[in-house]
Amino acid sequence: MEYKALIEDAAKAHALPPGLVEAVVGVESGGNPWAFRYEPQYYERHVAPDASTRAVAPCSRDSERQALATSWGLMQVMGATARSLGFQGAFLNALCDPAMGLEYGCRLLARLRDRYKAQGGWPGVVAAYNAGSPRKAADGRFVNQSYVDNVARMLGGVWPQ
């Protein structure tokens, strides 16, 4: 993968397995740092109801609200998530910078590891990365099992310890 050294550095900084970070990058963006995706359902559920969204100069309030509901960069970090993790830049598209996107993606992955790994292992952490929490359906599979399976495939079917 083109950004292997940056992936290894970001993973190491957050005590994450580099192979896992590389697998998430592969599934999320296919290694394209300029990948972005507006997620209207996220906007409707999490951004639109929050009247407190402030504009980050020189960005308009409306632009900021749209950017919060967009996933950015190699790890497809949601703008709102990046802000909650301390991103202060005026424009959330800065997350398309490979090092910046990896930093915030790994911050999130490390936070989810600390919260969910003991109960769900890496599959639970990965499910939470994609869906916010490792929710399971009535059949005992993750609600986003196909995402978890895609990451597992990128890992060659072997989860890190």
Q: Where are the predicted features?
A:
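Catalytic glycan-binding domains that act on GlcNAc-containing polysaccharides
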Residues: 1-161
